[in-house]
Design a protein with these regions (language model features):
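Short, flexible coil/linker elements and helix-boundary hinge sites characteristic
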Residues: 20, 40, 61, 80-81
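Charge-biased C-terminal accessory regions appended to nucleic-acid-, cytoskeletal NTPase
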Residues: 70-77
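N-terminal acidic leader/helix
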Residues: 2-42
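Acidic, low-complexity, intrinsically disordered interaction modules
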Residues: 26-29, 33-70
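Generic marker of residues within folded, mature protein domains
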Residues: 5-7, 49, 72
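Conserved short beta-strand edge segments in small beta-sheet-based binding/regulatory domains
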Residues: 41-48, 77-86
Length: 86
């Protein structure tokens, strides 16, 4: 199951997307790459392993003065059919 966590502060926002299987990893990475390619404002992206076998893809926008990342994150959540985002 793919789930997500969102965090935002002044001029900073982060979406962390957690997944378990290779299929989920492929789905997440391909769709995130496709969405990011559509925009000129590029994030920092990194992946990390967490306990219980999950991996997390973290997408961070810094100096997001115009809050462009919100629409980008919403598009990611929608295309990945994430039902719950904390």
């Amino acid at each position: 199951m793919i789930d997500a966590e969102f965090r935002s502060e002044e001029r900073f926002s982060r979406l962390a997307i957690a997944y378990e299987t290779k299929e989920e990893s492929k789905l997440v990475n391909e769709n995130v790459d496709k969405i990011i390619a559509k925009y000129s404002y590029k994030p920092e992206i990194y992946a990390t392993k967490v306990s219980n076998g999950k991996e997390v893809l973290v997408i961070e926008y810094h100096d997001d003065i115009h809050r462009e990342s919100g629409a980008i994150f919403e598009e990611m959540i929608k295309i990945l059919d994430i039902k719950e985002c904390n």
